[in-house]
Amino acid sequence: MKIKKIKLLKALALTGAFGIVATVPVIVYSCSSTDNNGGTGDNNTGGGGSGTDQQQGTTYTPAIKSDVTLSGALSKIYDTTNTGDSRKNTNTLIAEDIKANPENYFTNGEDLKKVEGWSVTVDGSFDSNSVWTGDAYSKWSAVADTHKGVYKSTSKQLNINSLKDLKSQLDTSAKIKAICDESNLVFSTADADSYKIQNELGFTGGDLLHINVTATQAGKTLNMDLGIPVSDLNLKITDLKVSVTASNNSTGNNVAAVSDLTTNFTYNIGIKEEVTAPTEKPNLAKTDKGEVMKVLKALGYTQTGDETKLDNDKVSNSLGLYNCEFTAVSATPVEGSEDKFTIKLKAKPLTDYVWEDGTNTEKEISFEATFTMTGN
């Protein structure tokens, strides 16, 4: 009996040991972080990123990064496709990007990305009431003798938190005149105190914002079309609010609900790579058709006083490819044509600028141009 009793006790001990092992779930730890904003990301504190023991998995508490700096296409923050009531607002677009790329926003984003069933809302305090009122771009830009200029590539980028903020930054004649002067809209005899912002914004080519500016010169009204490439704009939002609705998966992992996490959000709008081929037919001597710089000079792309170098702004304004440094590659006659050439250039974003894909490497662009051939 004593031997049987000892065997029974050993059996109970072994059963108890394996019983403990069997009831402990496999814990998938979320990323820890020293950045605590609505969640610490420390599994030992019960904060962001901690695992709540479930039989089926882990619940992750989203832990937002204190600063989020991104770059990319304008379409990530402004709906360039839809119009009217179907147009998505900036809050919705940022929320969609957070859901698709949580690793860019949360310290434990890689874990959150593997979980289904949770959703995101964003509050950037964007003013829904437009302050750009008056005539539409199609009307004011058609006024006779409208002077056009584009913000120079050497000018500084503009940090805004909304289009309303952009207008508020141009709240004096002095500020408006200064930005016009930087855009080749210089009128030495215009009344410096008469510069005003008028009418609605325009938007063309998917990458150029148009502002209507008026000023008084010799008793008459000057009408100006000030173009600002969207790649000159950085969206900067202090304390962007992010809230997450919990998932409710019966098996596997889950994401916990959190409200009003805040981050400092900066978005550098990238350069659109598409080019618009020139439509004018400038004169080109037949003897110059084999020399790329002379072909580019005929297009008006070279610097004043130095025809061996390209003028970045002249090239940009012609092709609609802004804030790049350009170098010539080739100008090759199109086969079977006497007056049409394929032009190839290399374009590299200037310092602090990027392409829509977030890179700033040099890329080759090409387009066709037609000339009026002269000489024998």
From Swiss-Prot:
Subcellular location per the Swiss-Prot or TrEMBL entry: Cell membrane
Membrane topology category: Lipid-anchor
Region (Disordered): 35-59
Annotated signal peptide: 1-30
Lipid addition sites, N-palmitoyl cysteine: C31
Stretches assigned to coiled coil: none
A GO term from the CC aspect: plasma membrane
Broad class of the protein's primary localization: membrane
Keywords: Cell membrane, Lipoprotein, Membrane, Palmitate, Signal
Record's compositionally biased regions (Gly residues): 38-51
InterPro entries assigned to the protein according to its UniProt record, in alphabetical order: Lipoprotein_p35
Pfam families: MpPF1
Lipid attachment locations (S-diacylglycerol cysteine): C31
Family: Belongs to the p35 lipoprotein family.
Listed name of the protein: Lipoprotein p33
Organism of provenance: Malacoplasma penetrans
Organismal lineage: Bacteria, Bacillati, Mycoplasmatota, Mycoplasmoidales, Mycoplasmoidaceae
